[in-house]
Amino acid sequence: VIDLYQIHWSNRSVPIAETLGAMEELVDRGMVRYIGVSNFSVAEMREAQQAMTKNPLVSNQVLYNLKRREIERDLIPYCADNDITVIAYTPLADGSLAGRSRLLPDKRGAVLEQVAQESGKTQAQVALNWCLSRPNVIVIPKTNNVERTVENCEASGWSLSSEQVTMLDAAFPI
């Protein structure tokens, strides 16, 4: 059984009702537990929800990190209001939020480093924890390194202070 089956991108050449109808049929057959989408706007999620007759839309996998916060304007609030989990891909901004200072040489990197030092955590852990502090947001950081996997897992189970969140929000505005 597939736990979560997602549409990766909206496909305007195939009606969303047809696609989601087929996905709901897979749920009915016991082959899939939950249906989600990826890279859908709020309007596309509304259309998807209207097309679904038997199952809720449970997730939207989207680009989200400290550097790319545009979805906070409408998508995150909509998902929170509709019990849809946001699955943040590229939460470390291709490594630039993981302590690679050459990729983040401005004051933002200094703020991230300061918060990491204050917290006794790595910059990557701070960046991931910041994402996790948002409503209905989980992260899927990419790595092929066992040590980084452990480090990423240690981004949960603790919280940034409200002052630290404010510092990060100011350094990385929407």
Locate each region found by the language model.
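A glycine-rich helix->loop->beta "capping" turn
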Residues: V1-D3, G36
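Specific alpha-helical transmembrane segments that line the substrate/conduction pathway
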Residues: L4-W9
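Beta/alpha (TIM)-barrel catalytic core signal, keyed to glycine-rich beta->alpha loops juxtaposed to Asp/Glu
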Residues: S10-I174
